Amino acid sequence: MELKDIAVAFVMGVGTIGPAIAIGMLAGKALEAIGRNPEASNKIQTAMILAIAFAEAIAIYALVVSLILKFV
């Protein structure tokens, strides 16, 4: 196992911890908000999906960096 492989694993591990925690918190808070105000569920769901997409973009950046490290 080369140092490059360890760097790739580290980048993916660290780069996906933050988005995973953020997505979990977003979903939990959205479910709480829908539970408190069911009439606003469409607006809450739309905002939640948009926020999840932004959080997931960080994990995709980590994937791109790890692929660059792996193959370049």
Residue positions per predicted region:
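Hydrophobic alpha-helical transmembrane segments of small proteolipidic membrane proteins, enriched
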Residues: M1-V72
